[in-house]
């Protein structure tokens, strides 16, 4: 994936309408070309991933969603041979060290705590996309798992 030469296909799984809108607006202001698809619960996410022929370049995954939460989705992604290589960035308001460590151990690429300010959101999304590209989709060590500004 090259941030300047292709449309980056991003999938956002988040049940909060406002967060989805802010995410979309932040992407529109970044100097990169993206295509955003959103789903609002874990069941919808897994159905989409299992039926699509072309996976997104990256999944931003909220933890607290109805019907199937982000932890359950991440586990399901990691046990699926067709999905386990999908880069997953946890994108959540909740933050506790045990959960963060568990998410890293279960295959997530990065963890972003949802920022409260729009400018921070823009910057952290850009940082996440740039970092994942720079590292060629390789999962980071635990000390680099949490992305912040």
Which functions belong to the PLM regions below?
Residues 7-27, 59:
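Conserved acidic segment of CheY-like receiver
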Residues 38, 67-68:
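Residue-level signal for the "D+5" position in two-component response regulator receiver
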Residues 38-58:
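Acidic, metal-coordinating helix/loop segments flanking the phosphotransfer/catalytic sites
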Residues 61-63:
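Active-site residues of response regulator receiver
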Residues 65-67, 96:
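The feature encodes the CheY-like receiver
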Residues 125-149:
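CheY-like receiver
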């Amino acid at each position: 994936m090259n941030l300047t030469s292709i449309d980056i296909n991003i999938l956002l799984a988040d049940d909060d309408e406002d967060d989805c809108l802010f995410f979309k607006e932040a992407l529109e202001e970044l100097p990169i070309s993206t295509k955003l698809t959103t789903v609002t619960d874990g069941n919808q996410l897994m159905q989409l991933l299992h039926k699509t022929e072309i996976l997104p370049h990256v999944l931003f995954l909220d933890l607290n969603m109805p019907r199937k939460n982000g932890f359950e989705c991440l586990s399901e992604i990691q046990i699926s041979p067709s999905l386990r290589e999908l880069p997953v960035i946890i994108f959540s308001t909740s933050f506790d060290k045990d959960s963060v460590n568990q998410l890293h151990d279960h295959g997530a690429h990065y963890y972003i705590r949802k920022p409260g300010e729009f400018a921070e959101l823009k910057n952290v999304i850009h940082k996440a996309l740039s970092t994942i590209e720079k590292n060629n989709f390789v999962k980071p060590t635990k000390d680099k798992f949490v992305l912040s500004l």
